[in-house]
């Protein structure tokens, strides 16, 4: 066998020459190295390669450059090289071509030494396009911004110590002058240098593509990932953010002693108004937080930015009633029209017992594309009208939150001053959910004072003036004299500090976005972490936004009643006869209601998806053929009653839902509560879902409930009326609280305590008390174990049937001997009533 060192195994001369040339290329170190050194390296390499492969033979040294070039293993495996990130194949290929770190390829190392830079092409810009003016330095150090933090601080204006201005004092406050369309000289409430710097930073983005700016903004804002979570939009999370920061003063207002003003067990609703706030994110949050214990009224401009109630996935939009001013649901919703302001005010007061709402939210804004620096001036009337609406519908002690923009002009600051006078406390606040690069901030007002009517009427007159001056060269430039504003030094100082603070914040945020546009590798590393912290702090579940899936009524019914015996729902009431009359001997335990038709169970799956069932297992749930809406997960015991209004040819008939009892209200199971409490909750629920602005919808009412010992009150409401289609024969009719009447079919009698408890009257204490027949215990307060839950009330109820044989008046047909008369029942009740006649 031939050895590798034999002459026959050596490379041919041609191959040796080729290797020599390769050695010359690989050994070259720089473009400036003399040719003699290259030749010397080539000679040494050739000599070495033309001899033996043995490491010990000849001891002829190779050129260092050539040797390094072919140390593929060290190049591939060395971790110290900045090229170690590349795989071994690419490194070997480069090594074979003679690559050495820090030098270029080529005979004289004339190749480029640095890696080819990534493309600086931005978005869809033309190849090589540079935006003149944008790429210049802003000379703003944005890197010293504070660390992102979920905890926020609130700085309130000092409490206003001056009296609320009256109409006489404000009579000459309004100043009309030449319309002003520049902002650069508005330096009364902000330093000139800061103002101009901010305007410059804003203007830089005028030439930038919007999509490019949005991408950079998304990467630059540490709070960007909060987004809308499972709500309709980001606005909902702004409200959640502010609600937490201000100690839930919107969704859980407190009284003067610091206790909750409203409890879920109370009969009072939390009323709110949402103006200029389509598509309704603020309202969706409030209704999600308070569920059916809140009722909202809304007015916004009709059109593409109207309320999107069908997109309220996390809350029941049935609890919200849009009203568009003059014309109601057919109005235009323009808040600058005085007629709309008055109409909305009257509507809200009529439906809140003339008290007004607990708080108003306003989030108005419109596109100012191309005129971003003039946003404050262009939005001045909108801002005024939102403030005016709040003073028109907020109840005494109520709250107000409204979006504002820059507040540099004396006009805007004057409006803030009027709020400062009308509310107990006021502050300007920018939540972390509001992007730092925009001029958006919120004025938050707490505790409306008494005696603000003159201010409201003054703002109303200013709005009329603004409407008259529209499309002219004149404008209202002042609503409060500068001397008055600056005369209140604490207010003036706060205003300047606030403006300059937000101005500095905005400048840094704009500079940061500018840097992120120029360097697309920059990003905020803590976005996900900050999002998690904020959601936990604000008590918002971290779940995706998903549209509610359609439900099968039977499946939903079993889901709501849980493990309750289905047979309970098929029980029929015990008829009240002479034989069963003894059951109502403990009269203090019973309540009664007038019936108008057959009892049914009604299931609400959201909107108009409403089904009824008569309680028999053999029957199915049937879609209700009425125009009404109910929140999902609602289960009621009802009657569908034909109500009548008027008599004769003008008589009108409408089908109404009458609630006898409630089981589940918008997911809240109330079956274990006392019957009286369930009826109170039913009345509260009906207030929340009623739509006074929609006369085309079938009404929902709660039965009037009477104490059994006061049953004679029912008969006061009974009279003979002519019913259209009855052949001219008067029929017995029961007139309800709303002046509508119906033909009664009988009276339901419901027991409110459960065995072995009963109710009695203490003559010594002159009080009712609860008595346990087994243990002999007695209490003046209601023992929880004595409460009759829904299923007990349902299967123990009695029904006093009135038919054609029922005798109440002499004008009616003769009495049926098998039926109890009015005198029979009333005399029995009176004889067993411990309270006396």
Curated annotation (Swiss-Prot):
Boundaries of every WW domain copy: 751-785
GO biological process: 7-methylguanosine mRNA capping; methylation; mRNA processing
Major location category of this protein: nucleus
Modification N6-acetyllysine occurs at: 107
Residues in RrmJ-type SAM-dependent 2'-O-MTase domain copies: 230-449
Modified residues (Phosphoserine): 27, 30, 52, 90
Polar residues bias locations: 36-53
GO CC annotation terms, alphabetical: cytoplasm; nucleus
Region feature (Disordered): 1-67
Binding site for S-adenosyl-L-methionine: 233, 276-282, 334-335
Disulphide bridges: none
Recorded superkingdom: Eukaryota
EC number of this enzyme: 2.1.1.57
Record-linked PROSITE patterns: G_PATCH (PS50174), SAM_MT_RRMJ (PS51613)
Residues that bind substrate: 202-206, 217, 373-375, 438
Name this protein carries in UniProt: Cap-specific mRNA (nucleoside-2'-O-)-methyltransferase 1
Organism this protein belongs to: Rattus norvegicus
């Amino acid at each position: 066998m031939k050895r590798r060192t034999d002459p026959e195994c050596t490379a041919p001369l041609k191959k040796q020459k080729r290797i020599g040339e390769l050695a010359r290329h690989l050994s070259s170190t720089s473009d400036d190295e003399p040719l003699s050194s290259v030749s010397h390296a080539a000679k040494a390499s050739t000599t070495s390669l033309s001899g033996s492969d043995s490491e010990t033979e000849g001891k002829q040294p190779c050129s260092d450059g050539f040797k390094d070039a072919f140390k593929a293993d060290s190049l591939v495996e060395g971790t110290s090289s900045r090229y170690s990130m590349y795989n071994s194949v690419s490194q070997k290929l480069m090594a074979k071509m003679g690559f050495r770190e820090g030098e270029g390829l080529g005979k004289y190392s004339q190749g480029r030494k640095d890696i080819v830079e990534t493309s600086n092409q931005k978005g869809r810009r033309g190849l090589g396009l540079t935006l003149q003016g944008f790429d210049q330095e802003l000379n703003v150090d944005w890197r010293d911004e504070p660390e992102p933090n979920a905890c926020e601080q609130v700085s309130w204006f000092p409490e206003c110590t001056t009296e609320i201005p009256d109409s006489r004092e404000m009579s000459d406050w309004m100043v009309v002058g030449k319309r002003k369309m520049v902002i650069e000289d508005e330096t009364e409430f902000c330093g000139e240098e800061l103002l101009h710097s901010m305007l410059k930073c804003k203007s830089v983005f005028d030439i930038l593509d919007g999509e490019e700016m949005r991408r950079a903004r998304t990467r630059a804002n540490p709070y960007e990932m909060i987004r809308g979570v499972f709500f309709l939009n980001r606005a909902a999370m702004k409200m959640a953010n502010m609600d937490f920061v201000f100690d839930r003063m919107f969704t859980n207002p407190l009284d003067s002693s610091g206790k909750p003003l409203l409890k879920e067990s109370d009969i009072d609703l939390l009323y709110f108004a949402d103006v200029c706030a389509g598509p309704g994110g603020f309202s969706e949050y409030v209704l999600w937080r308070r569920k059916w214990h809140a009722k909202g009224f809304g007015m916004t401009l009709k059109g593409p930015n109207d309320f999107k109630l069908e997109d309220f996935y996390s809350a029941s939009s049935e609890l919200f009633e849009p009203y568009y001013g003059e014309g109601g649901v057919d109005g235009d919703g323009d808040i600058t029209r005085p007629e709309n302001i008055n109409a909305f005010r009257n509507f809200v007061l009529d439906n809140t017992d003339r008290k007004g709402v607990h708080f108003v939210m306003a989030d108005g804004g419109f596109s100012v594309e191309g005129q971003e620096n003039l946003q404050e001036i262009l939005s001045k009337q909108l801002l005024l009208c939102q403030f005016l609406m709040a003073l028109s519908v907020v109840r005494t002690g109520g709250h107000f939150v409204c979006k504002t923009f820059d507040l540099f002009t004396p006009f805007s600051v004057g409006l803030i001053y009027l709020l400062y006078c009308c509310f107990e406390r006021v502050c300007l606040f920018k939540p972390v959910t509001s992007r730092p690069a925009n001029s958006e901030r919120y004025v938050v007002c707490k505790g409306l004072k008494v005696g603000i009517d003159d201010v409201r009427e003054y703002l109303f007159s200013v709005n009329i003036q603004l409407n008259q001056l529209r499309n002219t060269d004149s404008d209202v430039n002042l609503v409060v004299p500068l001397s008055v504003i600056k005369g209140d030094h604490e207010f003036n100082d706060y205003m300047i500090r606030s403006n300059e603070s937000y101005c500095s914040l905005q400048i840094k945020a704009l500079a940061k976005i500018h840097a992120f546009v120029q360097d697309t590798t920059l990003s905020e590393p803590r976005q996900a972490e900050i999002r998690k912290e904020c959601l936990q702090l604000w008590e918002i579940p971290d779940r995706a936004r998903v549209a509610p899936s359609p439900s099968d009524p039977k499946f939903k019914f079993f889901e709501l009643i849980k493990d309750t015996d289905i047979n309970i729902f098929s029980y029929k009431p015990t008829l009240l006869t002479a034989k069963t009359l003894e059951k109502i001997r403990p009269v203090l335990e019973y309540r009664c209601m007038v019936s108008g038709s057959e009892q049914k169970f009604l299931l609400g799956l959201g909107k108009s998806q409403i089904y009824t069932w008569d309680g028999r297992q053999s029957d199915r749930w049937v879609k209700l053929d009425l125009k009404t809406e109910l929140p999902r997960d609602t289960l009621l015991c009802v009657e569908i009653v034909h109500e009548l209004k008027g008599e004769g040819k003008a008589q009108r008939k409408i089908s109404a839902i009458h609630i006898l009892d409630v089981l589940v209200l918008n997911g809240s199971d109330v079956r274990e509560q006392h019957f009286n409490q369930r009826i109170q909750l039913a009345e509260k629920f009906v207030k929340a879902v009623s739509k006074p602005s929609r006369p085309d919808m079938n009404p929902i009412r709660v039965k009037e409930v009477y104490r059994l010992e006061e049953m004679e009150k029912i008969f006061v409401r009974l009279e003979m009326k002519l019913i259209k289609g009855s052949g001219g024969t008067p029929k017995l009719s029961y007139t309800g609280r709303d002046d509508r009447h119906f033909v009664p079919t009988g009276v339901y009698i419901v027991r409110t305590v459960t065995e072995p408890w009963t109710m009695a009257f203490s003559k010594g204490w002159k009080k009712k008390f609860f008595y346990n027949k087994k243990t002999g215990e007695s209490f003046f307060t209601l023992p929880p174990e004595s409460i009759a839950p829904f299923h007990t009330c349902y299967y123990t109820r009695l029904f006093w049937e009135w038919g054609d044989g029922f005798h109440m008046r002499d004008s009616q047909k003769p009495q049926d001997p098998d039926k109890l008369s009015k005198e029979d029942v009333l005399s029995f009740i009176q004889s067993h009533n411990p309270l006396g006649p």
